[in-house]
Every structure is written in C-alpha cells, then in structure tokens.
Design a protein with these regions (language model features):
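Conserved ABC transporter NBD signature motif
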Residues: 82-93, 98
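Conserved catalytic motifs of ABC-family nucleotide-binding domains
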Residues: 176
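Catalytic Walker B motif of ABC-type/P-loop ATPase nucleotide-binding domains
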Residues: 180-184
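Conserved ABC ATPase "signature" region
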Residues: 122, 126, 133-151
Length: 270
C-alpha cells in the first residue's frame, strides 16, 4: 500500500486518480463567510479553498472557530453571508448535491455504541440511498482499508478510542465522497493512535485523490508540504504552504510560526 513520504508530498500513485487531477473545481471553496452567536462573532469574513487531492490543515487554538466553520459547511448551521461550495456545488443552493460529495468526522464521537461496526456503517449508507447488499460490500471494503475487517461484527463499545476513530473515517467514506472534513479527530488518543490516524488519512489523499480539511490545534500533525490555514478568533491570519508560512514569519518551525501569527500583533490573512 502506498503512503506519503512523511514530508507531506504524495507518492507518484496519486497520478492514477484522474477525477481528482481533472477536477476544475476545488474540493472546498469558502468566500467571505461570517457567523455570529448573538453579539459574539465566531467567524469574520473567512475565505480559503481546499484543492482536490490535497491535505490541508486548519490550524487554530480551541475557540478559534473551526467547529463553527464545519457546522456551516455541513449545513448544521446556515451561512447567511458569503458562499460555501463543495466540488462546485453551493451548499445553500444545491445542498443535496454538495453533501453527497462530503464526508465528515466530527470532534464529538457519533457512533452508536450498542450497534456493531457493520451496523453503524450500513445504517449510514442507507441514509445516502445505498441498498443493503451494496452497503455491506462497501462496508467490507472501507473496513479492510482501515485494517478493521475482522472487527465488523463487534459492538463499537468494545473498540479502543483509536479504532472508533478509524470506524468513523470508514463510515464517512461509505458513499465515496470527494471531500473529507475532520474536526480535531485525534483528541483523546494516545501518540501511537494519533500517528496511525494521520497516516491513514494521508494515504486516502495519496491513493484516492480525496481532498482533506484536517482541523487541529496539534502542531505535530502538520508536515512540510502541507497547505496550512491559521484561524484565530474567527479570522484567517494566514494561509499558504507550510514553507510559505515559515518564510513569511521568518521562523524555523511551524510552532514558532503559529505563535507569531496568533499573537495580538499578527497581521491579516494573506
């Protein structure tokens, strides 16, 4: 199985995914999106894009607005300003078409602990209009990719935290989305489980050409070659390739770059 080179650069096998390479639309395009909860502005004119077949890190401390942004993209909240497009589909104008291209792993775990792994996946697939037989076949495929095929009949409550997260990713892939959103997916995991989860998602980008937006506050999950968006207090403070942020901030590592960008004197979005 192909994997990344640990520098954020996908292996040559990525060229075998024509739909990603040929896509004329970014996997996700957000333009001028703001959102408020009463008098508190959670997002302020946020704009960025995620290219098809790329790993993009949305980096920000807790409370930066990452979860609010995901709620807007997934239509849990309605965006009243700006536009959000998933593979060219406006989520307000064409919500069904947009959501059909989208897979999501939320920060809060949403699996039914009393159902088996297979039951969780099949139930999700039926919500997307898949028949039972095709849903079971697809479930076995995505579980094999996640090295969890042997746990298909186990109740979810008997899995480890890392295994539950891998099942949630498998569930998000059931309907073959072209964009995958992950909101702080490694929270609560040990170091080994966290590293395995990051590697699994990077393989999806490299092998299947899926566009990924990975929201995190953990610096170590970002690698050279990644595209990075720094979100702080609801505003995009910077965006660009990993190396671009180092040059812009005149720092030697992404942790120092991040700290300089979220300082009270940090500049506006690039």
């Amino acid at each position: 199985m192909a994997s990344s080179d640990h520098q954020g650069h996908p292996p040559p096998r990525r060229n075998l995914v024509p739909q990603a390479a040929a896509s004329l639309s970014p996997a996700l395009a957000i333009e001028g999106v703001s959102h408020s909860f009463g008098a508190r502005k959670a997002l302020d004119a946020v704009s960025f894009s995620v290219a098809a077949g790329s790993f993009t890190a949305l980096l920000g401390p807790n409370g930066a607005g990452k979860t609010t942004l995901f709620s807007l993209v997934t239509r849990l909240y309605e965006n009243r300003s700006g536009t959000i497009h998933v593979l060219g589909h406006d989520v307000r104008v064409e919500p069904a078409a947009a959501l059909a291209k989208l897979g999501v792993v939320f920060q809060a775990r949403t699996l039914d602990l009393e159902l088996s792994v297979m039951q969780n996946l099949v139930y999700h697939a039926t919500l997307h209009g898949m028949g039972f037989a095709s849903a079971r076949r697809r479930a076995l495929e995505v579980l094999a990719q996640a090295s969890l095929a042997e746990r298909a009949r186990d109740k979810v409550r008997n899995l480890s935290g890392g295994q539950m997260r891998r099942v949630e990713i498998a569930r998000a892939l059931m309907h073959r989305p072209r964009l995958l959103l992950l909101d702080e997916p490694t929270v609560g995991l040990d170091i080994a489980s966290r590293a395995a989860l990051v590697e699994q998602v990077r393989r999806l980008v490299a092998e299947e050409g899926i566009g990924v937006l990975w929201a995190t506050h953990i610096i170590e999950e970002i690698a050279p070659g990644d595209r990075v968006i720094v979100l702080h207090r609801g505003r995009v403070r910077a965006q660009g390739d990993y190396e671009d942020l180092l040059r812009r901030t005149a720092t030697e590592d992404i942790s120092a770059a991040f700290l300089s960008l979220v300082d009270d004197g940090a500049g506006e979005a690039a």
